[in-house]
Amino acid sequence: MHGSPCQDFSRIGKKQGGVKNSGTRSSLLFETIRIIKEMKDKPKWIIWENVKGVLDRNMRDSLFIYLKELEDLGYESKYEILNAMDFGIPQKRERIFVVSCLGANNFSFNKLERKETRPLSEFLEKDVSELYTMTQPYMLKFLNKSIDNSFRGRLKVIKDFSYNIYTKQMRVPNSGIIDIGNGRYRYLTERECLRLMGFDDSDIDKLEEVHSRRKNCTSSKLYKQAGNSIVVDVLMCIISSIMHVSANLLLWMI
């Protein structure tokens, strides 16, 4: 399972793409092919995740070349864009997942077990420090004018779900902000972002031990960890389905 750097595929980045041997971060996608070729025993299953921008007209050639090179190695691949909201997580996070199997691929995205989106309140902390309160006058002025619920199209007020969690959550967070009343707003905390990526609090506690923060400061490292992650619930659903497919195949062979 892997997710190569998405920055050059992203619709909000410089859109440099992931052309093989181009030297862009997203071109590291093709390191997967190199690694598989060097392995004595090829993995039965490969899962790749990335931003849906990889399917844009000026980006998708890289994906199709990747799939063709996997096919040349004996893999059959299937791909689909999945939204975390369809797997219980109240975050509008759409990502492409490619599931490749060495030999015939009986995996089906249609058979994944979708779940009702859980209430956002389950993911929010009850007592949040003033450290996370938005104080930038120009942003507050814009928000309180109620102009189309956005700041340059990027700043949104969270209601039933958050938007895409990226590596940088302060300043103008793509994930949105929380309305705390009386014309005041706050950012999502690091813990909330990680919860919205499917991590439980025990895992987050361990991360906080590793990435200790300075007093009265937020942790850019924890925000980055969240933004670079794959939503756990989506990934586990895919893995569970793969295990089911593999088990059925073994039973058929017996």
Place the predicted regions along the sequence by residue.
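N-terminal Rossmann-like NAD(P) cofactor-binding module of classical short-chain dehydrogenase/reductase
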Residues: 1
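Class I S-adenosyl-L-methionine
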Residues: 7-172, 182-186
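Conserved NAD(P)H cofactor-binding loop of Rossmann-fold oxidoreductase domains
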Residues: 4
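C-terminal target-recognition/interaction regions appended to catalytic cores
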Residues: 137-254
